[in-house]
């Protein structure tokens, strides 16, 4: 029985079905896009691996059930599919190998990158195929769909139709995408693995403990950030710093449009709210 489903055009709203009290899972699968794995091992643009929506949800589940485990699967290639053959290839070769009968929960968090007419046309049926495949190979799993930080009318319709057909709970997060919940240029990200970054600077200062304070411009605006480095080099002619270490600086506006830590916290809280998880 749908208890919350208001259709005004293609407004994105929660879909809540009566599946009984939410039982804390033993084993879960998260299928997501950049909000799950965009910063390598964690969601873009959380400042570290403990601050994205998955980490917040995982902590609550582990507190209730220390034996809880989960797996993360990138769904960006499924979002990119332009026909059914491509979708079935992904379902068969990427999704099915990680599905199992002992899964208690599958969280889907895709749809934001379905951004061309051919992708949207394919996704209309693909969203249903995705849920059907999960139900076939993980029959015990409760399925929850989280959408959408970035939205389009056609994808809203496809996601809602698929969720309605299979009685899948839909958690709407579009209302969270606003100032204060997004990341920002200049945000420092701590990676799980060491990496390197190059950045054109206006000036920089070497601080203690191998830290660099870097002043730089993006789009005519001035920014300042401090990063911990393991080593660095300076191309003085090009005024370009290159450093190695675990920390990077957000310099791209599209990356900065993703959730920041506060946005991810609110996404997780919406998940708990819709599923009535204390």
Show which residues each predicted segment covers:
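Bacterial Sec-dependent N-terminal signal peptides
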Residues: 1-23, 278
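Short hydrophobic segments within beta-strands
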Residues: 31-32, 146
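A short helix->loop->beta-strand "cap" motif at the edges of active sites that frequently abuts
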Residues: 68, 137-142
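Substrate-gating cap/lid alpha-helix
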Residues: 142-187, 191-203, 207-219, 226
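Histidine-centered active-site loop/cap adjacent to the catalytic His
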Residues: 195-278
């Amino acid at each position: 029985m749908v208890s919350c489903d208001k259709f005004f055009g293609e407004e994105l709203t929660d879909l809540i079905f009566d599946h009984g009290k939410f039982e804390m899972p033993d084993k879960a699968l998260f299928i997501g896009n950049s909000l799950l794995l965009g910063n390598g091992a964690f969601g873009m643009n959380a400042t570290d691996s403990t601050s994205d929506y998955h980490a917040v949800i995982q902590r609550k589940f582990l507190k209730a059930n220390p034996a809880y485990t989960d797996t993360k699967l990138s769904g960006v290639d499924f979002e990119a599919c332009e026909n059914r053959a491509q979708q079935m290839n992904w379902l068969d070769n990427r999704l099915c190998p990680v599905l199992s009968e002992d899964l208690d929960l599958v969280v889907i968090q895709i749809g934001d990158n379905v951004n061309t007419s051919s992708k949207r046309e394919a996704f209309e049926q693909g969203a249903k195929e995705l849920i059907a495949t999960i139900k076939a190979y993980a029959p015990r799993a409760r399925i929850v769909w989280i959408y959408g930080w970035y939205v389009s009318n056609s994808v809203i319709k496809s996601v809602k139709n698929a969720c309605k057909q299979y009685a899948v709970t839909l958690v709407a997060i579009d209302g969270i995408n606003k100032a204060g919940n997004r990341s920002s240029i200049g945000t420092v990200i701590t990676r799980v693995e060491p990496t390197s970054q190059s950045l054109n600077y206006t000036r920089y200062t070497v601080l203690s403990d191998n830290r660099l304070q870097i002043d730089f411009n993006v789009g005519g605006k001035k920014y300042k950030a401090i990063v911990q480095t393991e080593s660095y080099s300076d191309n003085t002619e090009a005024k370009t710093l290159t450093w190695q270490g675990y920390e990077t600086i957000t310099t791209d506006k599209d990356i900065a449009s993703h959730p920041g830590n506060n946005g991810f916290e609110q996404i997780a809280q919406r998940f708990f709210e819709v599923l009535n998880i204390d």
